[in-house]
Swiss-Prot record:
Species of the source: Xenopus laevis
Topological domains annotated Extracellular: 54-83, 139-149
Cytoplasmic side: 1-32, 105-117
Membrane topology note: Multi-pass membrane protein
Organism taxonomic ancestry: Eukaryota, Metazoa, Chordata, Craniata, Vertebrata
Protein name as it appears in the record: Oligosaccharyltransferase complex subunit ostc-A
Presence of the UniProt keyword Zinc-finger in the record: no
Keywords: Membrane, Transmembrane, Transmembrane helix
Function statement: Specific component of the STT3A-containing form of the oligosaccharyl transferase (OST) complex that catalyzes the initial transfer of a defined glycan (Glc(3)Man(9)GlcNAc(2) in eukaryotes) from the lipid carrier dolichol-pyrophosphate to an asparagine residue within an Asn-X-Ser/Thr consensus motif in nascent polypeptide chains, the first step in protein N-glycosylation. N-glycosylation occurs cotranslationally and the complex associates with the Sec61 complex at the channel-forming translocon complex that mediates protein translocation across the endoplasmic reticulum (ER).
Transmembrane parts of this sequence: 33-53, 84-104, 118-138
Family per similarity comment: Belongs to the OSTC family.
Subunit structure: Specific component of the STT3A-containing form of the oligosaccharyltransferase (OST) complex.
UniProt record, GO biological process: protein glycosylation
């Protein structure tokens, strides 16, 4: 494999560049990187790529038995399609569940007061459980009859 990498460099010669980092460029803090990761996770799980390509409506409408148009947030019976609000709501739940796990992890740090540890555990469990059960409710709205036992 080394010999294959060596073949192009028998003909090409790498330039001798002396690059230095610009003075205004600094290493971002850990919380800045974490915030960028959470925001990108929110956008990707929300289906931002799908929303840009397909351009679905933000909410849909359904005609009830009296002939009136009712707004609906979930595109029922379609696994491969979504409204924008549906994607954002689901993405919020996934992000809330992920943050709940991170909060649960932070409750294990040493030297944390007992009340703060209890509050972190409570908030973490609430975030994880609420996100899990709301995702199940969303699945029932998306696919009626699914997960019914």
């Amino acid at each position: 494999m080394e010999s294959l990498y060596r073949v192009p460099f028998t003909v090409l010669e790498c330039p001798n560049l002396k690059l230095k980092k610009p003075s205004w460029l600094h290493m971002p803090s850990a919380m800045t990187v974490y915030a960028m990761v959470v925001v990108s996770y929110f956008l990707i799980t929300g289906g931002i790529i799908y929303d840009v390509i397909v351009e679905p409506p933000s909410v849909g409408s359904m005609t009830d038995e009296h002939g009136h148009q009712r707004p609906v947030a979930f595109l029922a019976y379609r696994v491969n399609g979504q409204y924008i609000m549906e994607g954002l709501a689901s993405s919020f739940l996934f992000t809330m569940g992920g943050l709940g796990f991170i909060i649960l992890d932070r409750s294990n740090t040493p030297n944390i007061p007992k009340l703060n540890r209890f509050l972190l555990l409570f908030i973490g469990f609430v975030c994880v459980l609420l996100s899990f059960f709301m995702a199940r409710v969303f699945m029932r709205m998306k696919l009626p009859g699914y997960l019914m036992g």
